[in-house]
Amino acid sequence: MYGSTKPLDAATGGLATRQAVSLSPGRRAWKRFRRNRLGFFSLVLFLTLVVLSLFAEVLSNDKPLVVNYQGQFYFPLAKDYSEKTFGGDFETPADYLDPFIKDKLRQGANWAIYPPNPYGPKTINYFAKDPNPSAPSPDNLFGTDDRGRDLLAQLIYGFRLSVLFGLALTVIGVVIGVITGAIQGYAGGKTDLVFQRFMEIWGSMPELYLLIIFSAVFAPSVALLLFLLSLFGWMGLSDYVRAEFLRNRQLDYVRAAKALGVSNLQIMRRHILPNSMTPVVTFLPFRMSAAILALTSLDFLGLGVPPGTPSLGELLNQGKANIDAWWISLSTFAVLVVTLLLLTFMGDALRDALDPRKVDHA
């Protein structure tokens, strides 16, 4: 009575297929990535946490964001002021958590706007009622560590350090890995053989022992740790890129480019590299997870960042040393697990989105 719907279905399917084909590979991958709700939600949440951590000084600091004292505005985050500026007796830097200073900033028309968490990562709460480490309280929502420092502030700054360190180590590893892998895969022959033997020797070096030696010789710093881990963090990706270049250099479009007189550098950069980036992009979230774990592990062992620097590994070490202070281990472990889970979910979704065997459906 109503007729067949097969021609309409066929036409609709053909239109959807043509639309999918008309999309660029990047847009098709992004479309598949967004379809993975867990991966997309993880990306949004992770980026939100990272952006918030970049403004850690605004969210968690022991200095007010802005002060209005006797009709004048002061910005303690941008400039240090002495206690005398706010009615004190000394030229020492003002302690804005001191009840005397806080009372001065409340008198009359004076006012001050503090960050949501009025503690910095190194701020010691000398006015706490309980001995350190103290349990969560209205003054310190996540409690304090064994030195009296606010735990929430350390988690915020430690998360930022871990993410930025992981990102920097990942970028350095990708740059070195792509360059070395591309040279090996495209050149082949003796060049590839020499690189492979060098990587075998380099990879057999005891990385942990070298870290211990350098930590004993040089003053610990984030830059030193980043340099040492970068010496070994590129080899895994280099093998993937090498395999892609070995495969792609035999394809017809590379032979056609050579026949047209295109230079080897241009062929590698403009033709082979874009078609070899799938394993590189898929590798990024997992590489970043490994970098964050490496930093946390080394800090836990005392081989990481300088003492006093807020870090997740140092907090885990404090939790081990203070078993009764459950809030230290629990909160730090939760931050670390959530971070690694978000990166893992993003990596799985990215791998599926870049899988050429996946077919788009309307």
Q: Residue ranges of each PLM-predicted region?
A:
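Gly/Trp-centered helix-boundary motif
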Residues: 1-174, 178, 182-183, 308, ...
